[in-house]
Amino acid sequence: MARITPLDRYRNVGIMAHIDAGKTTTTERILLYTGRTHKIGEVHDGGATMDWMEQEQKRGITITSAATTCFWKGMDKQFEDHRINIIDTPGHVDFTIEVERSLKVLDGACAVFCAVGGVEPQSETVWRQANKYNVPRIGFVNKMDRAGADFLRICEQIKTRLGGNPVPMQIAIGAEENFEGVIDLISMRAIFWNEADQGATYETRDIPAELQELAEKKREFMIESAAEANDELMEKYLEEGELSHDEIKEGIRSQTIKSEIIPMFCGSAFKNKGVQVVLDAMIMYMPSPLDVDAIAGILNDKDEAVASRNVGDDEPFAALAFKIATDPFVGNLTFFRVYSGVLKAGDFVYNSSQGKKERIGRMVQMHANEREEIKEVRAGDIAAAIGLKDVTTGDTLCDLKQKIVLEKMEFPEPVIALAVEPKTKEDQEKMGIALGKLAAEDPSFRVSTDEESGQTIIAGMGELHLDIIVDRMVREFDVECNVGAPQVSYREAITTMVEHQYKFAKQSGGRGQYGHVYLRIEPQEPGAGYEFVDEIKGGVIPKEYVPAVNKGIQEQIKNGVLAGFPIVDIKVTVYDGSYHDVDSNEIAFKIAASKCLSEGVRMANPQLLEPMMAVEVSTPENYMGDVIGDINRRRGIVSAMEDTPTGKQIKAEVPLIEMFGYANDLRSMTQGRASYSMEFKKYTAAPKNVADEVIEKLNK
């Protein structure tokens, strides 16, 4: 089967934003205007197509990244049919893992901002993630019909707070309840949408006289930005002071793909104004898969030699699995992005991350939660495979003969944990299955068993994250469970260097056990992680036993000496030891290393580390004193305060343990008028009184 849409007419685009910027509503309008839905779904009545999980419709927020494919020919049908694969990403900070996974496989993103709130905490988090993957962006300032809306103020915030380079491609005609339309700065025409047909049609008029001067000024800035794309455009602009419409578009596209600028648009998705222009912008300014660098990877059977795959159907097949989901009707869905080659239903692929062969049975294209069965996928496609057994998020699927491992995704460590207990014996078995499936879907969610109490512990990125997990167990897997109070995931670290030795010897007739190690245990910089160094000389410990030493150390650092929390940022060097020709084996050296580390860490002045959260509170000014006083009581440190259209924004760092129940306290303190967000920032040493209390409680 030949390719239907040429690769240069593909756009893989993410819609990303802060919670409540109107991201899902924007996506809904895109689906309406591209003909994927015939009825508008509204978030506030729980009918949005892209928010397909029950919890999403109940809470009015997006949790999982729903993927959908649509086609667009332009507002004036001026383009060939373009295929746009859209991923709608969650805006809540507890679900940044979903954003991270989406950005990894996208070629471009549309950042949606609220015209009133502007750059909010989560905008900064998502922006950093997009910078990490070098994703080109366009911006859409939504909710221009709301009180306090100001398009150019938000553009300025993107510059000052996010370090972006926004280039307005439009200016708004009116704002708040008087928002009527936009002025297109390329054609210098005013666009007004028809409210009678939900904005499906529009008309252009002359620019209102009072906006002519501002439009000319902003147009000049836009042309300057386009001219910077290359020497030819700059030369023409300097000579003639003008560029043609096509040259402006060429320059803006080039600068956007290089992530030099962010073309900015505005509108009101809810009032059906401005969304079609954003679709046109995706086609004109966002990269196709051909505009993006070849995907890098390693040849796993050639000692990490670097390899790459160019985009194209005639290249060997390579794809990245970026999400696992459980569908109530078909079971496991593995979402993947195809970077090169062609894959047909029934083909075998090699999972190079796991070293396993998989058969691709059925494949589907997703439209939110509706499935359309397809027979093949090609370079540039985003699709889902049904029923793959051993694939996890971040795995590479590739050609059986031409193996490659694409870049791995990095996932954050959980910072909060809860104990969950099934209510009945029947629930016990179901809970195990449910948690296994949920953990497979979400790498930032972990399940473990407390060795002493036997309790099942679930850990995640925040209270809402774990709330939703528990909620899904009840709704999707019919598991009733009791939930314990949230527990903070502390860490342990050493503060001084220690050298220590341990001899493990059991020799009482017959074959015994013998392992003897000398370890140098040193603290590392925060965030450096674990490092193992082998300095054995002269074979005092045979080479084959050194991996067992490393394994013993790694197992021991999972359970620290103060309160059983993982030990972080530690460097361990094995530099001496001894062995016995008959009695030494891997197990003996593993035990010796484990015991040596445990004793050594106790001598290295260990300390407890607690997670610190970056907290941002938006509050009316008259409550500011109360809010700051409360942050101080919670051992928080205020780092900045900024004016906002509705009051003050306070930035602080607060220990996670002090933030439990904060939502209710803030609500009652400000009569429900303040809002906050928080995300994990770093681990720092807990004060002695706090550490003593935690250690005493856990060692009872």
UniProtKB/Swiss-Prot annotation:
Keyword Membrane carried by entry: no
Sorted UniProt keywords: Cytoplasm, Elongation factor, GTP-binding, Nucleotide-binding, Protein biosynthesis
Residues of the tr-type G domain: 8-290
SUPFAM superfamilies reported for this sequence: EF-G C-terminal domain-like, P-loop containing nucleoside triphosphate hydrolases, Ribosomal protein S5 domain 2-like, Translation proteins
Binding of GTP, residues: 17-24, 88-92, 142-145
GO BP term, example: ribosome disassembly
Subcellular location: Cytoplasm
Domain of life assignment: Bacteria
Pfam family, one: EFG_C
GO function terms (MF aspect): GTP binding; GTPase activity; guanosine tetraphosphate binding; translation elongation factor activity
GO cellular component: cytoplasm
SMART domains: EFG_C, EFG_IV
HAMAP family: EF_G_EF_2_B
Function: Catalyzes the GTP-dependent ribosomal translocation step during translation elongation. During this step, the ribosome changes from the pre-translocational (PRE) to the post-translocational (POST) state as the newly formed A-site-bound peptidyl-tRNA and P-site-bound deacylated tRNA move to the P and E sites, respectively. Catalyzes the coordinated movement of the two tRNA molecules, the mRNA and conformational changes in the ribosome.
Similarity annotation: Belongs to the TRAFAC class translation factor GTPase superfamily. Classic translation factor GTPase family. EF-G/EF-2 subfamily.
Annotated protein name in UniProt: Elongation factor G
Protein source organism: Ruthia magnifica subsp. Calyptogena magnifica
Lineage: Bacteria, Pseudomonadati, Pseudomonadota, Gammaproteobacteria, Candidatus Pseudothioglobaceae
